[in-house]
């Protein structure tokens, strides 16, 4: 049985399998295909030719454009058909031909997307990725499995991120970057392989960071990249700075979970 709210607008040319749950004021355009284990919450709009499969949950007020594919079987050869998920939050814009694959048991079972993100044309988000809030992946940006993007990350067009990489909050990756190691918060990076070239000051200004906070961030950047010391050697000083500067605390979580080493 399909559970479709009476206020939903669904094209007669769309295919919605029995079991799908469609919320209030959802709009589904022609030639969309919605699988039986899909849940779509209020005011989300699917333009034409969108395919949503698997155990996929989509929040409110998202816009999903034509030829996007969400919740499809992942490309991990270990996958054996387990009921893994894609979970997407609210107010995301998922543009044409974006692909978002379901998770794997080995990776926790969920590919998770937060709120207020923009995925531009032909972006790919592989199994078990965890994308936070306010991120942008530009055209043809690709994330391998298990990648983590923290808040306000921008991935430039034609960039590729290696599996298990962590990209810290407020990072700006220039177009065409190949990223195989973790990128600390607030960094601008570009290249093949990506290298750091300063703090993302313009992005921080746009998001309301004050001068003392940006000064602290620049100081930590210099500790990491210009002191000649290892992360283990500078971490105590970063911890001390974080006691009085909340914006520095994100470094502590980043280094706690970083396993691939950082870009240099």
Swiss-Prot record:
GO terms for molecular function: acyl-[acyl-carrier-protein]-UDP-N-acetylglucosamine O-acyltransferase activity. It comes from Haemophilus ducreyi (strain 35000HP / ATCC 700724). This is Acyl-[acyl-carrier-protein]--UDP-N-acetylglucosamine O-acyltransferase. It is found in: Cytoplasm. InterPro entries: Acetyltransf_C (IPR029098), Acetyltransf_C_sf (IPR037157), Hexapep (IPR001451), Hexapep_transf_CS (IPR018357), Lipid_A_LpxA (IPR010137), Trimer_LpxA-like_sf (IPR011004). It is an enzyme of class 2 (transferase). Pfam families: Acetyltransf_11 (PF13720), Hexapep (PF00132). It catalyses: a (3R)-hydroxyacyl-[ACP] + UDP-N-acetyl-alpha-D-glucosamine = a UDP-3-O-[(3R)-3-hydroxyacyl]-N-acetyl-alpha-D-glucosamine + holo-[ACP]. HAMAP family: LpxA. It comes from the Bacteria. Gene3D superfamilies: Hexapeptide repeat proteins (2.160.10.10), Udp N-acetylglucosamine O-acyltransferase, C-terminal domain (1.20.1180.10). GO terms for cellular component: cytoplasm; membrane. Homotrimer. The keyword Zinc does not apply. One of its GO terms (biological process) is lipid A biosynthetic process. PROSITE patterns: HEXAPEP_TRANSFERASES. PANTHER family: ACYL-[ACYL-CARRIER-PROTEIN]--UDP-N-ACETYLGLUCOSAMINE O-ACYLTRANSFERASE, ACYL-[ACYL-CARRIER-PROTEIN]--UDP-N-ACETYLGLUCOSAMINE O-ACYLTRANSFERASE, MITOCHONDRIAL-RELATED.
